Amino acid sequence: MDRYGNSEIVQYLYFYPDQYRFDIRNEIDWAEDHVLLRDYFPVDIHTNEATFDIQYGNVKRPTHYNTSWDFARFEVCAHKWIDVSEDNYGISVLNDCKYGYSVHDSVIGLTMLKSSSYPNPDADRGHHTFSYSFCLHEGDFRDGDIVSKAYAFNNPCKAVTKQEKNGKGNGVGSVFDFC
């Protein structure tokens, strides 16, 4: 648990022995004014562009600020994932509800919360639970099957109990449905 001003931030890390992946689940009680909460991740990947998931595909953006146009695009919208890759390996960040990213040189930035005063002075105040995941892969995001992994991360399987066909009983059956 960490504190920032009047806010409380808890991060849980999950490591998987059979995957090149780890997850970070965040629980944040946010009570700040005029603060942008970002997380930064330095990576050992050197490339001139990063790939961002957008609504009907993906888009590449530079990882440097050579022009005023590059500098103005300090943050890029991405839906489910971003990827930074060299020729034969890379890292992708998957998310379940955060959409503002930056990649500058070899540092990935993720905007977690923003407490602005306009248009809604209460925006992002209160309790938040969200997760993101880091996936290491060979090749680029296509070789790493990142699109499928991002969909699986956003739509995990959930086990639910099934009622008996006649509707009688306590409502708990012995058969599971997976959706």
Residue ranges and their predicted role:
Residues M1-C179:
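C-terminal (or distal) subdomains of carbohydrate-active enzymes
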